[in-house]
Amino acid sequence: MKHSSYFVLTAVCASVAFMASAAAIADMENPAVVANTTGVEVSGSCTMVDFETPEDKKSYSAMPFRRPKMRISDKFASSGRHSLEVSWDRAHRMGFTIRIPETDFSVYDRLAVDVVNAGENADQLTLHIAAKGDKLDDSVYSANGKRSTHYAPIGKSTWLVELERWPKKAEKSRSKVSELRFYALHPYGTTMYLDNIRLLRKGETFVAGRYSPEDEARISAMVKSEEDRDAATRAESKAALAKSMASVGMKSDAMLVGAATAMEHVLPKAPDALSKVKAVRGLKVRLARGEYESVQIVVAPTKDALKRVSVKCVEDLSGQGGMPFAASNIACVVMGYTRTQYQAPYAVGRTLYTNSADRAGYWRRGYFPRPGWYPDVILDHVRETDVAEDVAQSFWVRVACPRGQEAGVYRGELSVSAEGVASLRIPFEVRVNGFEVPKLSTLPVAMNFNPKGGLGWLPTNAEYAERMAAKKDPSAPPNIWKKRHMQWVDFLADYLITYDSLYRLSRSELDPEPNWEALMHLNKQGRLGPFNLAYWGTRKPGEKSMKQWREKTVPYYRKIYDKAKSLGILDKAFFYGNDELNPKDFPNIRRSADLIHKEFPGVPLFTTARDVDFGVGTNSLENVDIFCPLTGRYNYERAEKARAAGRKIWWYVCDGPTWNCANLHIENKPIDARSMVGAQSVFFKADGFLYWQLSKWLSPRTIGSSPFTDWVAASCFGFNGEGCMTGVGPDGIPLPTVRLENFRDGLEDYSYVKILKDKIAAHGKEDDWSRRARRLVAIPPSLVKALDCFNDDPSELYSWRNEMADMIESAIR
């Protein structure tokens, strides 16, 4: 039921509508006189706003954002005859507020908004439900009020805002809501129609918005237009790949097959996915002994869906004189995909060439990635899968070269098959270099592996319930992995990472002491890298603090220190702590450092505290040994000055940096990870790399056999993949991500540089060979020019890497 007069909403109201006269809409144009409502039956105990009453223009915004164009429209009304039309452009932060009479939301459990996106782009809005005077904090790190984010594809949708759980700081606002604040931080630009903003009581049946036959026809036409565009793009991409396949002598009436490097994303459901894929006469992989290197084979149906698709190396590869390269060293497994639900709160970068003839003529530009299905967890336990007609399915082909393998070229075939379809054979060549990479990363790494679940950023009620239950569920990822504890230790070492906890405290649930069994296991294998004894914090002045130091901290540290010393691994140890603290904390950090150095000599102190001078400036932490700035804050000149004074300067990433710098988010190109710990770490002389978490697992279930997983992408504050570089398969088996694979590849690239530097030193003379070698280890500008200007073209990285391999092999001969 609707009313044209103004009512004050109370907890006992039912079916009361607040019209535009009760809603001050920011920058709304004066609407023409409108007719009475059409009598459509709507869902909701209270319809608050349905835009049916004319109102003078009022300007109001609680946010420092650009205001969109707004007006009352006679299109896409789901209640009555009118809706609110809102239009905004690309990239500019925008926001608008709808005022309502002060309302008690505590008796309702949902708010619904009918939405039609009639623009050219899918887009999203965040809604902040607020009392008058509430401050809007649009940070992704905190929620000072009731907030939710909603994505609108082209066409119609209804946004449901769950009202049951409110942040504690916003509880007082819950009973006196007066403003609905909509905003977009990084919009794509579109036109949306909002209508029938209503409240629903607990248990009340939700009914989606209904539109007139004319509007339904418009909506259907919009959706079909988008579907037709996508279908045309997909058909064009398929036709181009089919033509390319024919040109290399590969033909199939049912199956399209191409290749991509391991450093690229092939988005499985993107209409243009196959445009990223190349038909090949054959595939080649080059690697050193002890190294891993991968490539992707992408399969798509020509028309109808394919069943039981697989890629296999069916026979050993053959080298000179019949020397075999075992097929068991070549894993061909299904790529898994993770769905990002919303537009990320950050931009990622891509390389644009300014001159195609000059490979050093490039720059970087940031863009905000679309939500959707991204390659992420590699399903090492899955060898075959079905492929739907609109999917481009990647298979990860990982080559592991045994350390005893003879150098040379090995040739064989990969077979691509599907049920009822003739197999396609791809010539496959593996070239083994005449040298070996170390078992340990040449670039020291410190990475936290401390599996945890969590509730995530603004979870829905269902997500909240599942994640709470997962805490006590023995089959949930944060628990079941423990069944395979030592398998995880070896798995991480295979990726050149030492099993460790950076945030170890005496009260830690997992590993309050270093896991001595794991560390000695790795030490015996020659794969033990740097590890953390315990977390060190600040120390305040005064007897109370010193008493705690003597009675609690020293005994805890002493036990761990003495154990590491007795096992003969103290030389690998450090104390990590004072994570990202600011200069105001420096006096207490210095006090703590003095105490630790005196009591536990020989163990370096490691911190990400924000000392921009790295221990050699005014108000610096002169008694700290290892500094670790964020890559985006790394200052080369200051780092070199600190190194000259005996400090080590590592670097790290977390949620930042974003835009044009490399990072480890799901949407970042995989090559970002490889470049960051490989070429970039060489170029900027980083002494090591730190990462705060490998195992932030919010998913309540392990990963199954479907490529389209329900593994949670937004692992930390809406940052996709942040702190989550691994996945958990059936029964707790470890699974890598594409990012982790590229991370290892980058560390192996770094090893190539170290090996070549050693060859330069041994060469001992100035000639064409040494000049060419020094150019390679200095990192050519075709790869890296600045932190925010590096090349993401895989061919450039391969060219550099292969040239280094040639130089190393020529030095050996």
Name every feature range the model reports, one short phrase each.
Residues 24-27, 185-222, 422-440:
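Extracellular polysaccharide-targeting segments
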Residues 226, 230-279, 303-397:
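Surface-exposed binding patches on compact interaction domains or structured appendages
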Residues 300, 314-317, 338-342, 347-403, ...:
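Aromatic-lined carbohydrate-binding surfaces of glycoside hydrolases
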Residues 644-674:
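Active-site clefts of carbohydrate-active enzymes
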